[in-house]
Every structure is written in structure tokens, then in C-alpha cells.
Amino acid sequence: MIDFLLEKFPVRCELRDGSPCSIRPLEATDEAALKEFHHVIPEREQLFVRNKILDGSLFQEWIADDSFESNLPLLAFVDAKIAGLGVLAQRQGGWKRHIGKVAFLTHPDYCGQGIIDEMMKLLVDFGAHYGMTRLESELNGERKSAIKSMAAAGFQELVRIPEYIQDMNAQYHDYVLMGIELIPDFENLGAGD
């Protein structure tokens, strides 16, 4: 369904500091590089990362979905190293099937350099093509750079609940839900939409 969209990869762009960046979907050969990437994410960010990412099972789940029907994980590379990860997740049914979920992680050396901005454009395009009418992202309130990038891309803060979520050390943090309305590719809308 998305083969013609995948033909645009790799997408090349320039970060704010002038570094060349290349973005493409996750490949089976990326497992070691992705593990290395997760190990450089600061401890304060790791407190919010799902364990499935750290233990490698999420990577296996993503690779098994080689048609990208459920998840589209994108990797941003700078100097042949992963500088960012962005994922679009599509619910396969139910009352929220029209709402995609996006999530991002950025290498600490590249925070604030526009990686999220570049991946966001691509994931918004894919979401519209999938027939999604909205995208949402759940964040902790401390992710100020990510919140700023998402707002610049048109996302609005839908909900902020103070001291609502707990990190892996049982410390409370603000919960933030951001969302954007899409203009979907209507030929790809599901029945009942």
C-alpha cells in the first residue's frame, strides 16, 4: 500500500548545525546500531523508554512488520550513526483506528538540531496516506525540545496533567498529550470512517 511512498527513501536533509542527515525506514541490519543508540540516550530519558525497546523485542516486532502496516519506524543517520528514531504506529481496528501514534527519540548530541522536525514531516505524510485523520503523541512534561518541535509542526497540546505519570524510579512527572488533525488520503480511509 505504501510502496510508492517508500521509493522516496533515503531522504536527505541538512540539520540546523549544517550536518548532512539521511532518513530511512528501519532495516533488519540496524539491530546493533539501534541498541548502541539506545545506550547513549541519557538516563533521565531511559526512565520513560519502554522496556520492549531496551530488551530488543520491539525491534523484532518492527522487523516482522516488513510491509509497515502497523508501524513505520524511521531512523535518521548522521556520519553513519543513528541520530534519531521516529515511529508512526497505526491501530489496526477499534474506535481509535483513525488516530495514529507518533514517538521520537533523539541522540543527545543532536537534540535541538531539527531531526524531529524532518521525521515529523515524513510521518505526517505517511499518516495521511494511511487514511488517518489525526496523529497523537504522549510525552512527559520534561521533553521540552520535543514538545517545541511538535508544536512547530502543527501539533497542539491537548492535555497536560501535572504529576500524573511515573518513571521507572517511581518519580512523578507531567503527562502531555499532543495531537494534530490531518487531511487524509480519502481513497485509503477504512470502512465506517
Describe the residue ranges of each PLM region.
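Glycine-rich phosphate/pyrophosphate-binding loop shared by adenosine-nucleotide-utilizing enzymes
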Residues: S19-C21, D79-L85, H173
